[in-house]
Amino acid sequence: MAGVWQHPFVNVFKHLRLEEWKKSSKEGDVTSVMDKTLKCTVYRIRGSIPAGNYIQLPKTSSQSLGLTGRYLYILFKPLPGKHFVVHIDVSAEDGQTVRISFSNLFKEFKSTATWLQFPFVCGAIKGSVYDSTAQGARQGMVGPAPSGSRWTCLLLDVQYILSLYLSRRYSHLRSAKLCSNLLVRNLMTSDLLFNPEVNFMEARHAKTLPDGISPMPREMSFPVPKGEKWHDLYDFIMFPSDSSKLPYDSIQKGQSMVTAPGAPMSRSPARERPRSVTISKPVQDRVSLIQQITTPRPMPHRSLLRVESVPERPVSVSARAEEARDLEDRSRGVEQDGGVHVYAHKTNKLSIHRHKSDSEQVICTKVDRPETLSVPPECKKLLPDPIFNLRRIIGFGGCTECFALWTHTGCSVVYPCHAIIVVLEVKTGEQRFLLGHTDKVSALAFNGSCTLLASAQTGSLSMVRLWHFQKGSCLAMFKTHVHSVSYLSFSHSGTVLCGVGKDGHGKTMVVVWNTSQASRSGEVAVLAKAHTDIDIQTMKIAFFDDTRMVSCGKDNVRLWRVRGGTLRSCPVNLGEYHMLEFSDLAFEAGHRPEKEAEDRTLYVSSRSGHILEIDYKNVVLRNVRRVQPGQQQHSERRDKQTFSSGPGIAINSLSVSATFCATGTEDGYLRLWPLDFSGVFLEAEHEGPVSCVAISPEGLRVLSCTSSGELGVLDVPSRGYNTLMRSHTDTLLSFSCHPTHPQLVTVSSDNTIRIWDTGTLQQLYDFTAEEETPCAVTFHPVRQAFACGFSSGTIRFFDITATALQAEHKQHRGAITGLLFSPDGSLMYSCCSLGSVALYSIGHKEQHVLRVLGNVVCKDSERGPMALSLSSDGRLLAFVGPTEYTVTVMDARSLDELLRVDVSILDLDSTTLDCALGLAFSPLKPHHLLVSTSGNKILWLDPKTGRLTREVTQVHKQCCSSLAVSMDTRYMLTAGDRLLKVWDQRQPGTVRPQVFIGHSEAVQQVDFSPDQQSVISAGDAVFIWDFLAAPDPEFTKTDCVPALPFALHSSAALDPSSEHRRDSTFISSGMPRGTAPRPCISSPPRLDISPVQGMDHPDLFSESDDGQEEEGNRDEQERTLVPDTRDNLVESDEQSSVVIIECQPNRAKLLTGSKSNSSSLREGMVKSTHEPPRPDSYTHFHTRFKASCLAKGMCHPPEGQEMLTLRALIGYNGNGRANMAWNPDTGFFSYTCGCVIVVEDLHSGSQRHWLGHPEEISTLALTNDALVLASASGSGDGSSLCQIRIWDTQDGSCMKILTHHRTEVQAMSYSRDDRLFVSIGDYRDGNLALWSTKGYELLATSRLFQPVHAVTFNPAHFDDFASAGPGAVSFWRIETQGTDTQIKVYRVAVPEEVGTAAELTSITYNSTSLLYSGCSTGQVCVWDCQTHRCFLTWEADQGEIGILLCRGNRLLTGSNTRRIRLWCVAAVQELREKGSGASSTSVLMEHEMTLDGAIVSATFDDALEMGIVGTTAGTLWYINWVENTSIRLISGHRNKVMDLAVAHGESHCATCGEDGSLRIWSLQSCELLLQFQVLNQSCLCLAWSPQPKSGPSTEDQRIAAGYSDGTIRIFSVSKTEMEMKIHPHPCAVTSIAYSTSGDVLLTGGKDGQMAITSPRTGMTIRVLSDHKGSPITTIECTGRKLTGLPTDGELWLAASTDRRVSIWASDWSKDKCELLDWLSFPAPTSQKDLDVSVPTLAAFCPWQPGTVVYSGFGVEKEILFYSLIQKQVLLRIPLSHFATSLTLSPAASLIAVGSNERLLRLIDTSAGTKQDFAAYDDGVHLCRVSPSGNLLLTASYNQVLVWDIQNS
């Protein structure tokens, strides 16, 4: 509000009272004069020295004007024939002061981090010689003001200037300094755009002005005589301007502000490039540095895309949609689309301001330039922002392959990839990016310490950027004065930079810059520059002298020196070698104290194979050598490579270290020579010519680049070669992702097909077509194969695993423009540029053509490679054709035409015909067809009727080259103009798209990855972006994605007989299926020809034979009708606010009768077939999704003969609500964990466990005397009602089981006298039940028409209780007459100040019948229960309040912001009498604590001084307000427990979880002792180090853990720290084990690779790939040696998901590891038995040495005992269910087996007995027996149960 006084404008001279000179100052010749033109007093400033004649506003530089207006208006007139200077100092939001100066003294634009200097072009009288000259010239007009200079109104958009040129946010105007020579009338700041042509009088008569334009205030306007025009007398300049006289970086006169009545003002007009350079249309539209390079076109334009920031540490490229605090919205008129501005910014993200809307209205104007329309301010931004994050780039080079640099540590290499600079870590392959260049990077250079990096981009407007390399920030950017920079060289100190390039006439130019101030102020000055006729290939600054340089090129080697601002050179006398073409040079490395710094050898290489040694000090040619002839290469001659005098091999690059020299030659060899060049001691052959070599700083590795796009490192000591990056050498045309493997296939104009590993970016395979270009490619959805279409019309089918051509089809004659597989892979579709389309049958052994149609597809090769589109169900095929104006939809099974749509006539208002360019089906039904058109539109067509359902306009400036839709159809991707855009399709027209840059060429294709976690775009390179949008919960909940094809799960993919069973079911996205899969109907859909749209007439339905679609439509209709149905149910009882529900005694007996009566009652219940909408409240209980189910039968142990007893349970269910009970008087304390109630003694820590619930317990209720506990859970199967169990707290017996609610119980409460008990069902159940605690008979029920979140009894009136729900509180009254019970309810809405959308989520009474209710908005309402009115509200939190407790004059609140607060509410009773006039200031907060999760349960003593609080993090806290302390009582995992292990000595155990935590617990107290947390990773497996031979010692105990990023971390328990981090795997580590000696770690990965690693050194000793392709599930070692085996050593085994077990014998001290045996187990052939959740389990049998115990997914449910000695199965133990976990006791012949049916089975193999134990609400996925065999630990999701084994 501080800036309100500045609205609408501030007259600065009047504000400072300039005439008094008290708040301002003047210096020199400053006088006030009367101006005849303006007829008012103005100030004249004149003098030959501007710095000595000026007006300063305010008086001193330490003061600030503090004016926040966006626009600065300066009314001035330059004095004829003179120069003037104006300085404007502004402050940015980060506190940085920036000076903006403009003057006709400046010759060119200059920019530093703190100073912008703009040349000013003075206007002249119309028709004068100056005006004529200005119109004809394009540059050189900066200079003294002409004699006819006029009064000028200069409008500076300070906010935009600061944002555009320096990427800073404008804060306020600090000062202004007006220097001679000029006349100035005034300065004004405002947030409004004023039109100087119009004054208030004219505006009042005109009544209307263009949107966003205001008339000039009276005191600022210029007088205009009658009959004259304002622009004939004065100049109006708006900067940034729309002028075309000079380049963008000068201030000059442009067009008038308003070009036509009613036409809005252009905000940021287009700018043209100098016309001396001819450029193509794509180049014109490039995203330019500080520059929009677009030319006006007579067509509507969209809003300006403005880049807000370029990352200084470029980890991601993002499109941030911030409104930028008035940058886009406040008082802004309209914007002309001029492209995207890119510039340096000190942030970590690249942000772009996007469209204000998806579509814009078209307005006809009378001007000859495009007009941009205003955008609605209500447009929202797309969230998350940014939605993309650039993660990886596959590519190298682009403009040049001659630059790749080492960092000074040798850990990373830096190389260009088109317009992006990539920093690649050699060991890990991780990439980070330096972003900012808008064209291809042509040169790179480091200073000596690698702290500064210089980079140049190609093009006629070449730019050089200086980077702070560690931060990734751009320190400076500047023009190079050359057409294109070809080479850069930094001095060792980093203070001098040299560049070589060509000027506009093609002449070589050398420029030397002073960069010493770049790090401080960002200023770079030209030291010297020179033109020369000689050719320069390489130029380097001598590392020992910043003023000396050496260059080489064709016919010359020259020495250069900078002295006195001039650059001079002299040639080296080369004698007979002066005609050679020299390619590279290098100085002798190292420094010898006895020699001068310049006394060293200069090595120069040539294209003829010569290497010259030049004495640099004496400028003398010392020696000449030559590489051996090309025909005597290493492949043909094995003798030593030497120099000779014969014809040589062209040397492209040279690098010299202190001990050897490296050369890269045209024959593809990297050769290493000693410095005497006696012979090659190491060489590496490449696929193409080596273009660059660089020796690492330590001299042990050599970096090499090839012109074929390969970047690699040669390790000299080990003679190993590591390929870092491969790349296509031409434009990418198409790509395809494999649905199930992390593989990407790409095709390019370089005639190659390449397959990449998307995890490591390594090239796996490549195929080369010599005489034809691959045009389109697609992966087979099931097999490891792909199809590729070529320019000749041939389609080839490649088998990847066999790396062979499997089939070839030659049905087409034109280039292939479209190629697709059906979702099940049984069919293939193709089309070509000559108009034909073909359908193929794809079998495992044979492929044949089913049908070919000619002249049906549009004959245009430009539509490839995405000319075809197939619906996700495989039923509809669409393409553009037979003309470019039509789109055809066919039956994908038969190619029968179903529909043809003419897209050219859909827009009736358009004067041009629209052509269809590309298309795509939306994945979800009704499978809308998206069509991109030449009119920059995306059309959404109904695939049945062809009707236009939606339209998105102004998608891109040029054509949309590719589009894709996410699996949930919420997001749409489009590519065009080198940009990517992301659109939210759920709210079209109201959410701005996000825009992403980075590509330097047109984007050929963009698509989502199969798992929807990434987006891939291809053009100049392959960009892999992280897609950060959260999955749509509605999409994951509904069955929108059918099941995975059977062939993906097992060997059925190889079975030809299974082909006929396949359908076109789409491949799963990896998200869990919400409902059971429906059968897929293979018959084609009938075309609905009804002209009526279903959405317009919901009572009309079209016929469909697709049951799934029909059911899906019915789901949507019934979901919307559920609230109305519930309303009718309630309204039918009584049409008033009081509902009376009567309940007869016999009805109560019926409800509490036998189970058969309950079932018969259940059949008669009125229930909706579809669930109501889920409440948007964390307070409401939602049971966790479980894929497991309850077992049908159990083997219960005989009483007293149980082999297991439950000792302890680790964890608390943070998913429950009010599921903890504590009575401070009796000390009774209980909580729930899964389906178990834990009763714990707070003094001793001992636990009792009450079992019986079949499902997760949702809530608890304790009577006031703490003698009875009620608990509620689901039923466990859909056929029965959920359970409410009544427990006796004294002996733990279950007294009663109540069944009434259908789904879950949300809340329960006992009355104050414990006589009544009320239970509330969840949102699906919608029932309230009132029970009598005497026998627990049902007294009354009520149907609730809205969900209820909380219920509680009034302590003052035993017959009253209240409930809270959405928007209202309900007061209930119980009335009893004899045996009849009635309940009445009065429902009161929340006050208006709380909001109608607020939900009441918690309630509590005080002792005087005041009811406190907490809201989802964080407010607390206080209600008078007698009058049923709310008399007080206050904001108690920023989040939803889920817990309320009131004791006396204190109130406790707990919310989902993780905070609990204690309030003093003593004054509330007094405020009760004041009614609505009560003030919330009388409520005071006394204490506040922040815990580790949202608050879900709380119980306190009567004084609210101490209590226990439960959170969603699975923690129970002891809270003491008096001492202000919180102590963790109970801890547990919030997410799934991934692994557990017991330490030697059995005093501790360790668990790890999905959240990346590794926790160590005490097995005595079950307390959490230690926790190691790794962010953003999952900890998947762990292992304790083995017990040392000296005996147990806690000091030596370590834990090794494997993580999802492929790393292993070793933690010391005693030191409580991480000792080592190892990265042996490229993907997740799924299994880990120590060898029995502890010398090595054995780990298995998700890719099936196994690594043997030393835990002492961290080195990976060996990698085993025998299980490659199937994740490792088990690794186990045994120290027992067997006499019957052929080999000695330690035995260990590994099992993988493909039902294979390998057994190994190893002697690690001898580096010996041999495969001993290989076991493979069959799987069922029936598809209905397929269960991919069953793991492969294997273990060594402790009591039978040499025996392996196996269980897995097989033909039978069983455990197998396999003898390694006898090579046969010894024993089979049948199981009732497949095992999901398995462990064997080392002390007895016991096997513990967990299953997905929530059972733990203990099998005594010696006695042949088995016992089942049920204490789980989910599958038992982990079982571990302690080393002594006394304890058994099991895990079910996040619960850990500790059992005692009765070995007797």
Swiss-Prot record:
Gene Ontology BP annotations: centriole elongation; cilium assembly
UniProtKB keywords: Cilium biogenesis/degradation, Cytoplasm, Cytoskeleton, Microtubule, Repeat, WD repeat
One GO MF term: microtubule binding
Feature: compositional bias, Acidic residues: 1102-1113
Keyword Cytoplasm: yes
Broad class of where this protein is predominantly found: cytoplasm
GO cellular component annotations of the record: centriolar satellite; centriole; cytoplasm; microtubule
Entry-linked Gene3D superfamilies: YVTN repeat-like/Quinoprotein amine dehydrogenase (2.130.10.10)
Chain's role: Microtubule-binding protein that plays a crucial role in ensuring inner core protein localization within the centriole core, as well as in maintaining the microtubule wall integrity and the overall centriole roundness and stability. Required for efficient primary cilium formation.
Protein name, entry field: WD repeat-containing protein 90
Originating species: Xenopus tropicalis
